[in-house]
Amino acid sequence: MKVAFIINDFDSMNLEKDTSVFLMNEAFKRGYDVFSFGVNDVTYKLNNIFAKCEKVNFPDPSLLSFTKENTDLQHLDQFDYVINRVTPPFNKEYLYLTQLLDLADIKCINPAQALREENEKLVILNFPEIIPVTKVTNSLDEIKNMFKEGCKKIVIKPLDGMGGKSIFSLSEFDKNINVIWETITQNGRKHVMLQE
């Protein structure tokens, strides 16, 4: 089987934290031919979508080290699966890519339309019975209300972040709650997620 991963640049990945590397490694261990390409590697022509891919090999699958070899332009319908792993922030190039993927007759594990329409942080709100107490707000009062409502600790995180960046754990008596709120919400201009 052949699987292609749409990723951010390998050189910018944190190999210890980036799930894409673990997914590629696991696919390789299972005998898949693993390829990767980026948002800017895509070409649409003659009603087909192509990408300048790199073949990814893991010489020792027990390690996260890998090798890459360039390939010719690959027709995306030749892959058994395509997995979009591009991380935020998303820009117009990413939006265009998802629209091109919609036009292609390919097996995309995470459909482009769903990626455009669903925020990965907000999608959990569809499952209130299995998530901790959660609020989405830009209000400092709501942060303080969570403590009044009985939460001992809360986690505050941006809706568009990834990789653990700008995530804070707060307790009721932290002296820097106001500063964290100002920073993460840009003084109330951005919504954030609060979780017990």
Where would I find each of the regions flagged by the language model?
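Conserved N-proximal alpha/beta basic substrate-recognition cap immediately N-terminal to
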Residues: S12, E16-V136
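Short acidic, glycine-rich loop/turn motifs
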Residues: D60, P158-D160
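Phosphate-binding site of ATP-dependent enzymes
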Residues: L140-D141, F147-K153, D160-E196
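Extreme N-terminal starter segment of soluble prokaryotic enzymes
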Residues: M1-A4
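Extended, domain-scale alpha-helical bundle/helix-rich regions
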Residues: I7-D11
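Generic structural signal for individual residues within well-ordered alpha-helical segments
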Residues: T43, I143-K144
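Short, well-ordered coil/turn residues at beta-beta hairpins
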Residues: I6, I83-V86, P158
